Amino acid sequence: MLIDFSKMHGLGNDFMVVDGVTQKVFFSNEVIKKLADRHFGIGFDQLLLVEPPYDPELDFHYRIFNADGSEVEQCGNGARCFARFVRLKGLINRDRIAVSTARGRIVLQLEGENQVTVNMGVPQFEPGKIPFRAQKAEKTYLLRAQEHTVMCGAVSMGNPHCVIEVPSVADAPVATLGPIMERHERFPERVNVGFMEMVNASEIKLRVFERGVGETLACGTGACAAVVVGISQGKLKERVTVTLPGGKLTIAWKGPGQPVYMTGPAEHVFDGQIEL
């Protein structure tokens, strides 16, 4: 079966994007792993699948698969690429796009110069909604992870995040502490691990070890998580520039009960076909 796809990226966080509206597709875990291989496949951090809406009030359903084949609930950089893809492919002729994900609904707004703003929804701090094993919600948690003692924030942006403040992201133990924290026993569905350096109240630097992927050049939900944790701890203002290895995102959050808005680029790289 010959499948059409597009290769896209958001700040270097790269995706294989597939139209599941006009063509019938199915991807097994093994097929996704092979396609994700950067030497023998197409190579990507996540596969994004556009499906018809489950709800008639929405435009599409948005599915995300990590390079290891696991399906996840949300991907912010992917959401921006999703919006640009459906517009480029003529699947919709509006700039405002409402989609469902495995964890809820998000609204995508196409702006000028390949920029997309995404309403990422309301962050969840309640442990049961992250999910995270704790008696009650706290602004910071003290966790033991092998020989490490870690102070972190925990939040869900539709997927679970642990945010660790570090003096310098350049020296952060992403490769060593990242995989340990990803599988920490208090995160029953594993977790994305962010290492955040405070530059000032309006700017942070961030590196993210993504669940099921490893470190990526950018993580949209990770940027949102880091900012809302920083704001909740009284360290950041309502609008923050996040510098990731792949570039910059703007994150805005007005506080508890309010949605998080993420603005950043979505780039189309090439189109292709592959035999499945």
Swiss-Prot record:
Q: In which pathway does it act?
A: Amino-acid biosynthesis; L-lysine biosynthesis via DAP pathway; DL-2,6-diaminopimelate from LL-2,6-diaminopimelate: step 1/1
* Endpoints of the signal sequence: none
Q: Kindly indicate whether the keyword Cytoplasm belongs to this entry.
A: yes
Question: What is the superkingdom listed in this entry's lineage?
Answer: Bacteria
Q: Site feature Important for dimerization: at which residues?
A: 270
Q: Where in the cell is it found?
A: Cytoplasm
Q: What reaction(s) does this enzyme catalyze?
A: (2S,6S)-2,6-diaminopimelate = meso-2,6-diaminopimelate
What EC class does the entry list?
isomerase
Give the matching InterPro entries.
DAP_epimerase_AS (IPR018510), DAP_epimerase_DapF (IPR001653)
UniProt site positions, description: Could be important to modulate the pK values of the two catalytic cysteine residues: 161, 210
One Gene Ontology MF term: diaminopimelate epimerase activity
Residues that bind substrate: 13, 46, 66, 76-77, 159, 192, 210-211, 220-221
CC per GO annotation: cytosol
The Gene Ontology biological process terms listed for this entry are: lysine biosynthetic process via diaminopimelate
What's its EC? 5.1.1.7
What residues sit in the active site?
A: 75 (proton donor), 219 (proton acceptor)
What keywords does the record list, in alphabetical order? Amino-acid biosynthesis, Cytoplasm, Isomerase, Lysine biosynthesis
Give a short account of what the protein does.
Catalyzes the stereoinversion of LL-2,6-diaminopimelate (L,L-DAP) to meso-diaminopimelate (meso-DAP), a precursor of L-lysine and an essential component of the bacterial peptidoglycan.
Q: Which family does it belong to?
A: Belongs to the diaminopimelate epimerase family.
Q: How the protein assembles, per its UniProt entry?
A: Homodimer.
The protein here is known as: Diaminopimelate epimerase
Can you name the source organism? Aeromonas hydrophila subsp. hydrophila (strain ATCC 7966 / DSM 30187 / BCRC 13018 / CCUG 14551 / JCM 1027 / KCTC 2358 / NCIMB 9240 / NCTC 8049)
Classification from the root reads: Bacteria, Pseudomonadati, Pseudomonadota, Gammaproteobacteria, Aeromonadales
Q: Which gene encodes it?
A: dapF
